[in-house]
From Swiss-Prot:
5-phospho-alpha-D-ribose 1-diphosphate binds at residues 128-132. This is Xanthine phosphoribosyltransferase. It is an enzyme of class 2 (transferase). It comes from Limosilactobacillus reuteri (strain DSM 20016) (Lactobacillus reuteri). Its main location: cytoplasm.
Length: 191
């Protein structure tokens, strides 16, 4: 997605450890117009899949997931990272390791919002090693729901996440695919 790649070039910052900081438009400050276009693109890519719900992990996946839900007229469920006093024990849970924060979080989705006949689309801001998507897949397995695929805003193609998901038969659609973050420069995969 050209518009997204331009935003990354203009506002993205490469940090040590192959971390791409995009807090100017995605992870802290959110560009609503860009998120709308991202939602429209995912809606088009997954239009004929019979999707019933969109899942993401809080918090940076919420904006693109909500815009995708808006475009597809579908509810969005975000997996919570922290236990809430308002959420009871009727939860599906999975442990997810965060590459950027170097911590493990237990994510959870209330069973109340999951139906046995659901077909879900997973949306996430980044795909590097695939931990967040793997956590959502684990919850999908527990719930017995079908998975249509994963819509990824930014994929680090030089890390194994996308390849491993595709090997498992998961459809992965990434809007910006990064080949390298060497020398503090973002280099995109050339299609």
């Amino acid at each position: 997605m050209k518009e997204l790649e331009e935003k990354i070039k203009e506002y993205g910052t490469v940090l040590p450890g192959n971390v791409l900081k995009v807090d100017a438009f995605l992870n802290h400050q959110v560009d609503p117009q860009l998120m709308l276009h991202i939602g429209q693109k995912f809606a088009k890519l997954f239009a004929n899949e019979g999707i019933t719900k969109i899942w993401t992990v809080e918090s940076s996946g919420i904006a693109p997931a909500v815009m995708t839900g808006l475009e597809m007229n579908l509810p969005v469920i975000f997996a919570r990272k922290h236990k809430s006093l308002t959420l009871n024990q009727n939860m599906y849970t999975a442990d997810v390791y965060s590459y950027t924060k170097k911590t493990t979080n237990r994510i959870s989705i209330s069973k109340k919002y999951v139906d046995a006949d659901d077909k879900i689309l997973m949306i996430d801001d980044f795909l590097a090693n695939g931990q967040a998507v793997e956590g959502l897949l684990e919850i999908a397995d527990q719930a017995g729901v079908q998975v249509a695929g994963a819509g990824i805003v930014i994929e680090k193609s030089f890390q194994p996440g996308a390849g491993e998901l595709k090997e498992r038969g998961i459809r992965v659609e990434s809007l910006a695919r990064i080949q390298s973050l060497s020398d503090n420069k973002v280099e995109f995969v050339k299609d």
